UniProtKB/Swiss-Prot annotation:
Upper lineage: Bacteria, Bacillati, Cyanobacteriota, Cyanophyceae, Oscillatoriophycideae
Summary of subunit composition and partner proteins: The gas vesicle shell is 2 nm thick and consists of a single layer of this protein. It forms helical ribs nearly perpendicular to the long axis of the vesicle.
Family the UniProt entry places it in: Belongs to the gas vesicle GvpA family.
The protein, known as: Gas vesicle protein A
UniProt superkingdom: Bacteria
Pfam families: Gas_vesicle (PF00741)
Transcription found in the keyword field: no
Species in which this protein is naturally found: Microcystis aeruginosa (strain NIES-843 / IAM M-2473)
Signal sequence annotation: none
């Protein structure tokens, strides 16, 4: 996949359209410790994509119901 470079600026609508078309995953992990004792751990994975994009990639990795049921 090649990175496209343009000299013109993109509008917010173009950016949102590209994110929904391609999808984006934000994976975050944080830990709060005091004197070596873990007080709080947070893990988060946020997926932003259109329903069509999600279903296309979820089916490819076997996350949909139709992919889970053997034929």
């Amino acid at each position: 996949m090649a990175v496209e470079k343009t000299n013109s600026s993109s509008s917010l609508a173009e950016v949102i359209d590209r994110i929904l078309d391609k999808g984006i995953v934000i994976d975050a992990w944080a830990r709060v410790s005091l004197v070596g004792i873990e007080l709080l751990a947070i893990e988060a994975r946020v997926v932003i994509a259109s329903v069509e994009t999600y279903l296309k990639y979820a089916e490819a990795v076997g996350l949909t119901q139709s992919a889970a049921v053997p034929a």
